[in-house]
């Protein structure tokens, strides 16, 4: 079994979900007392969040690249970045290491393609919904048409992630708000919705939405288990 490197802590709420999914995935496939070989580096998210919102992405890239090198030095065979937003600096992280990076958008796109989805809604932080590092990859590499909410809805989605979900604060009112936004995306033609922030599944993962939901944390972890056991 290969050792999975996990760059986490962004936020730790979703890193818990990753750790559970990786271990459950290995146990389901191998049975018994088997569990995943995981090397985790969990960063202090407060500093990362400040750099995100100040726009200092080069500093986040340097910080996370150093963590990735430490994971590699510890013996990991490949790397997961356990957050959608910080895939903005995935190229810099990938350039800093010699082990493969399993990209969260690629794993999600492969699942969408396998299911025949061509037009998909995207929820996440404003960075993920508005910037090209994620949407552009889905469009250019996989030919997916990506829909995002309007500006006011994007702001609500973003605020709920940082002010509530990253703190483990799960509110029914926010769940209803997300479901309404997803219904609007479905009305606009989305065949499915990507939960493009690893915390969102904590809020709506068990809900019956207007369209199928693609939980990027679960998909990323499943792809990692497949690679680890290949």
Feature locations, PLM:
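Non-catalytic structural scaffold of enzyme domains
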Residues: 1-230
């Amino acid at each position: 079994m290969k050792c999975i490197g996990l760059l986490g802590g962004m936020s730790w709420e979703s890193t818990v979900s990753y750790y559970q999914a990786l271990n459950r995935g290995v146990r389901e496939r191998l049975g018994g007392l088997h569990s995943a070989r995981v090397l985790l580096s969990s960063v202090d998210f407060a500093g990362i969040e400040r750099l995100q919102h100040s726009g200092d992405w080069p500093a986040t890239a340097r910080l996370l690249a150093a963590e990735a090198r430490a994971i590699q030095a510890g013996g990991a065979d490949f790397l997961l970045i356990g957050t959608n937003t910080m895939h903005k600096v995935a190229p810099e992280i990938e350039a800093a290491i010699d082990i493969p990076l399993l990209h969260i958008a690629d794993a999600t796109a492969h699942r969408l393609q396998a299911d025949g989805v061509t037009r998909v809604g995207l929820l996440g932080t404003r960075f993920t919904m508005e910037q090209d590092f994620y949407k552009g990859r889905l469009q250019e590499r996989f030919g997916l048409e990506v829909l995002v909410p309007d500006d006011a809805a994007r702001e609500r989605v973003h605020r709920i992630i940082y002010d509530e979900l990253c703190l483990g604060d799960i509110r029914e009112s926010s769940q209803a708000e997300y479901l309404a936004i997803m219904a609007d995306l479905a009305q606009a033609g989305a065949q499915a919705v990507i939960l493009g922030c690893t915390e969102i599944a904590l809020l709506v993962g068990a809900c019956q939405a207007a369209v199928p939901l693609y939980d990027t944390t679960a998909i990323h972890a499943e792809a990692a288990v497949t690679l680890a056991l290949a």
